[in-house]
Structures are given as structure tokens and as C-alpha cells.
Amino acid sequence: ILTVDPNNSETLYLGTDDDGVYKSTDGGESWKKLTVSSLSKSFGVGDIIVDPQNSNNIYIGTVDYFRLSESRGVLGDFGIYKSTDGGATWEEFNVGLNHLGVFSLELSEENRILYAGTRAGGVYWISLDD
């Protein structure tokens, strides 16, 4: 998943299948891995949204995955996470989701509603003005 900041085309966010989120502030020349402290070091990203009204507000939908290693399997974390500081820190934003894998996010600018499409087939929404 590649998302361009709608207010700065040099700022890009890259979500991976099982290695988290990366950020570039130079149009993709270099990348920095973002740390989401409440998630495991490796997690899958279903979608990334940058708020067009405030580029510091970023939402990621994380997806569940199962990775096999030589000794065991590991179930990944999933849900919605929000940053209000351009990706420096993150908090869980799973109001009503009960940790469902999120594969799609859409933000209605007019209504300020964030929609989340889940693995379970449902669509959830939350007002960002609350």
C-alpha cells in the first residue's frame, strides 16, 4: 500500500504485508520504518489514510496474518491505529471494531467520517469530530 500525503507530494507512506509502515519525506529516495509500540515489530497493513485537513493525522488499518517460523506460528495484530504527530507515535483507534482485520479505509472529508472495511465483511464507521 502506497499513500501520498495530499498536502505534500514529497511525503509518502508505505504499508507492507508483514513488516509495518515506512515513511519517506523526500519523494521516496529514503525510507524510515515507523514504530507502532503497541503492535509487534512486524505487522501487515491493509490501508493508510492521511487526513487532508491535517497531515499529522494518519490512520492505518492493520490486518491479521499468520507467520510460520521453525519453532512456532505467530498471529499478528490487527485493527485501526491513529497518529496525530505525522507517524512519530500511534494509539489504538478500534472503537467498536473488536480487533478485526482492516483491509480498506476511506475518509469522508465532508462528514469527517472514517469508514473501515473488515475481513469479516462488515463496514464500520466513526465520526472524527467527536
Q: Could you say what each language-model-derived stretch is?
A:
Residues I1-D130:
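Extracellular glycan-interacting surfaces
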